[in-house]
Regions:
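Structural/interface elements that position substrates and couple domains in central-metabolism enzymes
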Residues: 1-431
Length: 431
């Protein structure tokens, strides 16, 4: 493990924590095409809030030469700066298009970038979630064609799927076991040893790249399907006038009952990755029923929640048109500023279609990002001057634990709790 110089391509929710971890032991050059992002990181500011200012500044090096000679992190958007590295780790996003088909363009672009800078003997490791076969069928040919180097002769490839949990300060990257793999036996061992040197939870060396790819994608498919199951239960038990969370608590008294809760499934992983496996399955002539059914059910929950809210308002004798409605939380999960693929937007849009005046409050999300991506101007404070006929707890941010709903409730206000976050006795209904 001598003379290792690492470049992490993509410095977002996945890449930055990984780069910082490696920077404690190795020279690391972080690369991102977003120049503003790079500039802020070099000044010690992480807008994703995954890395504290103190932790970031402890590894950031302002002099590139110091980084190459010693451990530390130097961030750039200049390709020439990463040519001196010999391990390239790709952590770019893998989204879907408007038709929910896999969009590999960020991954292909990253492969092209790497192909322009790698030398003989270098390693390329992919962490982005993909369908089984993507690394070998889509990425490696790009690198070979551009670089004119040959796999397992001139360069080596590995796949080690990311397991970052944004917003979770307990299960950080070094505390989560890492699956590793390589394009041949020697490269697999070297890649496994690289991760093993910084991951205190240890590693699991998979027998092939495809196995590692498949392992990652089914992790998220499994979670998506399990949430879809309890979301369906929530719909059924609502019709029976039974509280779903009371049922889950009772069932959870058995040791082997899996603890999943109903809710919105958004973000860049769980709500996206099942489409990757489904697409690949269809290429082999198999139509995956459970995977796609789970996706459809989970994608329906925003509209379902909005309709339940409207029904509750009508039951209390409220008119719907032009009534003030407040949504607490807009990010795709709690205690995280990430608004990518948030399903709270489905609640918002449905309520707007009903004619209500919907206000969004989220202390974690960047208001400029919400405006830019979704065209919504969130409110900046809950001052009690505006009263609401309906309040929806959509995201369980810690900041909402001590909120006094009475200050912002109008007469005959209904409170709907998507997350079973508040005490049961202060809400009208929970999912």
């Amino acid at each position: 493990m001598n003379d290792i110089r690492i470049s992490v391509i993509g410095l977002g929710y996945v890449g930055l924590p990984l780069a910082c971890l490696f920077a404690n032991k190795y020279p690391v050059i972080g690369f991102d095409i977003n120049k503003d992002r790079v500039s802020k990181l070099m000044s010690g500011v992480d807008s994703t809030l995954e890395i504290s200012e103190e932790a970031l500044k402890s590894v950031i090096r302002t002099n590139e030469k110091d980084t190459i000679k010693n451990n530390g992190l130097y961030c750039k958007s200049d390709l020439d700066k990463i040519k001196k590295c010999n391990y390239y780790i790709i952590t770019v996003p893998t989204p879907v298009d408007i038709n929910n088909r896999p969009d590999l363009s960020p991954l292909i672009k990253a492969s092209q970038i790497i192909a322009a800078v790698i030398s003989k003997g270098d390693y390329v490791i992919f962490e982005s979630t993909v369908y089984p076969g993507a690394t070998e069928e889509n990425c490696i040919p790009v690198i070979e064609n551009i670089s004119k180097l040959k796999l397992n002769i001139d360069f080596f490839v590995g796949y080690s799927p990311e397991r970052i949990n944004p917003g979770d300060k307990n299960h950080t990257v070094e505390k989560i076991k890492k699956v590793t793999s390589g394009s041949n036996v020697e490269s697999a061992i070297n890649i496994d040893n690289l991760y093993k040197s910084v991951i205190i939870a240890g590693t699991h060396l998979a027998p092939s790249i495809k196995v590692a790819e498949a392992a990652k994608v089914i992790e998220n498919c499994q979670r998506d399907i399990n949430i879809a199951f309890v979301n369906e239960l929530a719909k059924i038990f609502h019709l029976m006038n039974i509280d779903t969370h009371d049922v889950l608590e009772a069932a959870g008294s058995k040791w082997n009952f899996l603890p999943f809760k109903p809710g919105l499934v958004g973000g860049h992983c769980i709500g996206v990755d099942p489409f990757y496996l489904a697409q690949k399955a269809q290429e082999f002539g198999y139509h995956p029923e459970i995977i796609l059914t789970g996706r459809r059910l989970n994608d329906s929950m925003g509209g379902y929640v909005a309709n339940q809210i409207i029904k509750l308002m009508i039951k209390k004798g409220n008119t719907i048109k032009s009534q003030n409605v407040l949504i607490l939380g807009f990010t795709f999960k709690e205690n995280c500023p990430d608004i990518r693929n948030t399903k709270v937007i489905d609640i918002y849009n449905e309520l707007v279609d009903f004619g209500t005046k919907v206000h969004v409050y989220d202390p974690w999300a960047n208001p400029n990002d919400i405006k830019h991506v979704y065209g919504i101007d969130p409110i900046s404070t809950l001052d009690g001057l505006k009263k609401y006929k309906a309040i929806i707890l959509a995201v369980g941010h810690d900041e909402f634990k001590n909120i006094d709903l009475n200050i912002i409730k109008d007469n005959d206000c209904i409170v709907y709790d998507v997350k079973a976050f508040f005490e049961k006795n202060i809400v009208d209904e929970r999912l």
